[in-house]
């Protein structure tokens, strides 16, 4: 089992023990993070970024690691999240294999990876861990907490669990609860991993690794991350050249199949399967309705921020724009000046990672007005 930690990653030690919402605790755990910009003397210019399932804390290039980050188009000097103005902290989720303690990390009690002995992970656990990092920077209140995809859930959990922790919130392609369609897709992804004989109840290694299960899980994910509209225009029904196919009668034939295969093969050995299972399930479990007798809008209305922006792509099938509209409506009911923007982007759920032409102006406009 392997962890994948970018150069320049910083670490914060969590309180020990660190209890989990659903029971159990970690001892000697840590959270990975990176920072950009300069914290103001009164610590009033801090922004927290909480991420989706797979990203590390390296959202953008910085002095510690000049390599481009996963959100390079959004974060940096003069960009939408302007590090000349803001002090930005990006936290890798608890339960990940990219620096924060997760199932692939060594259990200090045994000297072996936690594997399935890792406590049942919830979005709220990741939110509490992120705030430990924020407090360690000397920040009592954030100017804004920004979350995308799973991070949109984490950001809402941060705001629910820590009243007054932020003056504003940007929710990008996120939600206050998992929808049945999303739960169904993620359940199939987890099943593909668990049915691979090499998963072996979580006891795999580099030589006996559930590669087939991870490939299928990733392909299913990529299908939900993009959109049919994009693929119609990008691939159509174009077939592969003869030198790109093999003798398998049911092998790859269309360009879109090759695209999925390439994405899957690039991912399978760079994300730990058990971490994937834990983080995926945490999204299915998350539901702000738990905080308001089963009413998700009432749960959102309990959150107190001054301003909020909820934004998404109209082609997103995993976190559809109705969920961002719901976030804005619920926060507005709680007294926030909340705005919803649905963008006409063809790139589905992943649009926030690639369609900077549409997403950056909305985020910049909101933050510039703070």
From Swiss-Prot:
Leading EC class: transferase
Compartments, record wording: Cytoplasm
GO terms (BP aspect): cysteine biosynthetic process from serine; homoserine metabolic process; methionine biosynthetic process
Matching Pfam families: Abhydrolase_1 (PF00561)
Stretches assigned to the AB hydrolase-1 domain: 46-355
Site (Important for acyl-CoA specificity): 186
Main location: cytoplasm
EC number: 2.3.1.-, 2.3.1.46
Important for substrate specificity: annotated segments: 52-55
Any single Gene Ontology cellular-component annotation: cytoplasm
Pathway per the UniProt entry: Amino-acid biosynthesis; L-cysteine biosynthesis; L-cysteine from L-serine: step 1/2
One example GO MF annotation: homoserine O-succinyltransferase activity
Catalyzed reactions: succinyl-CoA + L-serine = O-succinyl-L-serine + CoA; L-homoserine + succinyl-CoA = O-succinyl-L-homoserine + CoA
Record's keyword terms, sorted: Acyltransferase, Amino-acid biosynthesis, Cysteine biosynthesis, Cytoplasm, Transferase
Source organism superkingdom: Bacteria
Active site: 149 (nucleophile), 316, 349
Annotated positions binding substrate: 218, 350
InterPro entries to which the protein is assigned, alphabetical: AB_hydrolase_1, AB_hydrolase_fold, HAT_MetX-like
Matches recorded under NCBIfam families: homoserO_Ac_trn, PRK00175.1
Stated role: Transfers a succinyl group from succinyl-CoA to L-serine, forming succinyl-L-serine. In vitro, also has homoserine succinyl transferase activity.
HAMAP family (alphabetical): MetX_acyltransf (MF_00296)
Subunit annotation: Homodimer.
Record's protein name: Serine O-succinyltransferase
């Amino acid at each position: 089992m392997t962890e994948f930690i970018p150069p320049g990653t910083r670490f914060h030690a969590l309180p020990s023990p660190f209890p989990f919402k659903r029971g159990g605790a970690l001892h000697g755990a840590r959270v990975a993070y990176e920072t950009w910009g300069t914290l103001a003397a009164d610590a009033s210019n801090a922004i927290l970024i909480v991420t989706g399932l797979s990203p590390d804390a390296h959202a953008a290039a910085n002095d510690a690691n000049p390599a481009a980050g996963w959100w390079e188009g959004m974060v940096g000097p003069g960009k939408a999240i302007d590090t000349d103005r803001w002090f930005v902290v990006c936290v890798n989720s608890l339960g990940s294999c990219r620096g924060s303690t997760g199932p692939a990390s060594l259990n200090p009690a045994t000297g072996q990876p936690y594997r399935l002995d890792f406590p049942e992970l919830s979005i709220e656990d990741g939110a509490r861990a992120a705030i430990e990092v924020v407090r360690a920077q000397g920040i009592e209140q954030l100017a804004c907490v920004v979350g995308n995809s799973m991070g949109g859930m984490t950001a809402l959990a941060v705001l629910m669990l820590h009243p007054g922790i932020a003056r504003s919130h940007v929710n990008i392609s996120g939600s206050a609860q998992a929808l049945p369609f999303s739960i169904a897709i993620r359940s199939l992804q987890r099943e593909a991993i668990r049915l691979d004989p090499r998963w072996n109840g979580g006891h795999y290694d580099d030589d006996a690794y559930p590669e087939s299960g991870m490939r299928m899980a990733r392909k299913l994910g990529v299908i939900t991350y993009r959109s049919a509209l994009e693929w119609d225009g990008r691939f159509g029904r174009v077939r592969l050249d003869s030198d790109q196919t093999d003798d398998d009668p049911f092998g790859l034939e269309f360009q879109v199949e090759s695209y999925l295969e390439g994405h899957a093969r690039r991912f399978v050995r760079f994300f730990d399967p058990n971490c994937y299972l834990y983080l995926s399930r945490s999204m299915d479990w998350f539901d702000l309705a738990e905080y308001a007798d089963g009413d998700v809008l009432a749960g959102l209305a309990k959150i107190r921020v001054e301003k909020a922006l909820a934004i998404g792509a109209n082609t997103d099938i995993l976190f559809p724009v109705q969920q961002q509209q719901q976030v804005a409506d619920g926060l507005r009911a709680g007294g926030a000046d909340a705005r919803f923007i649905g963008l006409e982007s063809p790139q589905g759920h992943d649009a926030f990672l690639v369609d900077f032409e549409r997403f950056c102006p909305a985020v910049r406009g909101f933050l510039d007005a703070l």
